[in-house]
């Protein structure tokens, strides 16, 4: 085991056992390297690995700290609340669509029809790659909405975004491969990547999206690049056309794989939705990942991949080892929902409501003195923060407001602090004013 990994393992154990408390400041790499008798880069690599895994956070010149969101192991079993267990969304809670706007009665009718007309064959195990009807409906949807020309055989249904990433890594990754990860970027995907013995390679994001030149200069031999080109999570910027061509050229030249997470692409409030990077994929190096969690509802637990034709056999083999876990009834109901035009009408309605709800919360936050970062789409927003945004988020969380600190989404990159929040379940203007006032009070 490399020395830096041994140091990282010892640090992780100390955090798990409570010897290093959440928020504790670690010695500088210079100081600790002298004490351990190793090079400074060895300590830096150990710190970087734990930052990538979420155990540590960097706060610029202030140093490296144990994450506030890490809790030591307890000697007794405790009941804990997991994300998604609360039936009532918390104010500003991210990752949820507008649950009040979903057409539940329509969905029930479509599903009821499927129940009434199903045959004995519908009670058997479904296709390991997902039901043909749903894959065909997704092909039609992607052709019209995202400019992607593919065949049903290229589509694989999974039970969520994490399952999609796991399927990709099972099919294509080898131990020791590296993956470009947007910095800042979605933190909960990092443990899934490292669990497959793939190294996280943080690449900074600027106003034009992922800095492809930085990625090539620092990690030219990466095997994967995981990106959100349509609406970067969490900054909301789009990958420029020049950089789209640049990353495709790099992937073709390096025989690397681009995983396109088409996050929030359906919700753009100024201009038409951008076409997917996959629509430009002449070299066939892009694996497209989508989900219905934000457009419909998270309990559906249904996502999909579009893989290159030459990789179908590899993915089908892996899918046979861990078959699609989305119930056949739900898949067929969703196929009908798409094919009959209900999904399109629902998206149109949601865009209108989200534009209104975003306007309400922007105005309310501005009235309370907050500065909202402009974004062209998505279902979340960033407000700029001066000072320790992690401490600000902790205060807001204690007041029952589910904001997140932008710094918790960073790995190595530095930048201004901020709070991340969603507006999807702000149901009226009065509620927007109320929660904005609560946030101001919590941070005062």
Labelled PLM ranges:
Residues 61, 279-314:
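Active-site PLP attachment segment
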Residues 284, 403-404:
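Flexible, Gly/Pro-enriched loop and linker segments at secondary-structure and domain junctions
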Residues 92, 158, 203, 289, ...:
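Hydrophobic residues at beta-strand termini and immediately following loops
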Residues 121-255, 265-267, 272-284, 354, ...:
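Conserved core of the PLP fold type I
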Residues 1-114, 118-123, 127, 134-136, ...:
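N-terminal basic, amphipathic alpha-helical segments
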Residues 97, 229-233, 294, 426:
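Short glycine-rich anion-binding loops that position phosphate/pyrophosphate groups of nucleotides
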């Amino acid at each position: 085991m490399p020395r830096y990994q041994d140091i990282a393992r010892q640090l992780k154990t100390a955090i798990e056992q409570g010897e290093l408390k959440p928020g504790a400041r670690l010695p500088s790499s210079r100081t600790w390297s002298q004490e351990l008798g190793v090079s400074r880069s060895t300590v830096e690599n150990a710190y970087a690995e734990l930052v990538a895994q979420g155990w540590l956070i960097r706060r610029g010149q202030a140093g490296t700290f144990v994450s506030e969101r890490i809790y030591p192991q307890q000697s007794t079993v405790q009941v804990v609340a997991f994300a998604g267990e609360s039936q009532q969304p918390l104010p500003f809670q991210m990752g949820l669509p507008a649950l009040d706007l979903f057409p539940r009665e329509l969905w029930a009718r479509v599903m009821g029809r499927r129940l009434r007309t199903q045959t004995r064959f519908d009670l058997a195990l479904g296709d390991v790659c997902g039901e043909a009807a749903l894959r065909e409906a997704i092909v039609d949807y992607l052709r019209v909405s995202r400019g992607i020309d593919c065949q049903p055989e290229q589509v694989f249904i999974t039970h969520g975004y994490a399952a999609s990433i796991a399927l990709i890594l099972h099919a294509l990754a080898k131990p020791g491969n590296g993956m470009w990860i947007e910095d800042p970027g979605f933190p909960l995907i990092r443990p899934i990547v490292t669990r497959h013995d793939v190294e996280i390679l943080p690449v900074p994001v600027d106003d034009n999206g992922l800095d492809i030149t930085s990625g090539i200069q620092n990690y030219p031999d990466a095997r994967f690049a995981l990106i959100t080109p349509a609406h970067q999570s969490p900054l909301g910027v789009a990958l420029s056309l020049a950089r789209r061509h640049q990353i495709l050229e790099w992937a073709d030249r390096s025989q690397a794989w681009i995983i396109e997470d088409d996050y929030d692409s359906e919700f753009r409030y100024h201009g038409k939705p951008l076409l997917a990077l996959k629509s430009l994929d002449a070299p066939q190096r892009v694996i497209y990942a989508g989900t219905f969690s934000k457009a419909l509802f998270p309990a559906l637990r249904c996502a999909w991949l579009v893989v290159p034709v030459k990789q179908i056999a590899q993915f089908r083999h892996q899918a046979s080892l861990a078959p699609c876990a989305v119930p056949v009834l739900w898949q067929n109901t969703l196929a009908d929902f798409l094919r009959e035009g209900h999904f399109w009408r629902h998206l149109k309605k949601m865009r209108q409501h989200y534009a209104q709800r975003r306007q309400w919360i922007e105005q309310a936050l501005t009235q309370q003195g907050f500065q909202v970062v402009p974004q062209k789409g998505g279902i979340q927003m960033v407000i700029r923060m001066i000072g320790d945004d992690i401490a600000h988020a902790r205060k807001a969380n204690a007041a029952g407001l589910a904001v997140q600190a932008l710094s918790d989404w960073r790995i190595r990159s530095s930048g201004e602090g901020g709070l991340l929040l969603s507006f999807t379940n702000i149901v009226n203007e009065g509620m927007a004013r109320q929660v904005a006032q609560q946030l101001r009070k919590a941070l005062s």
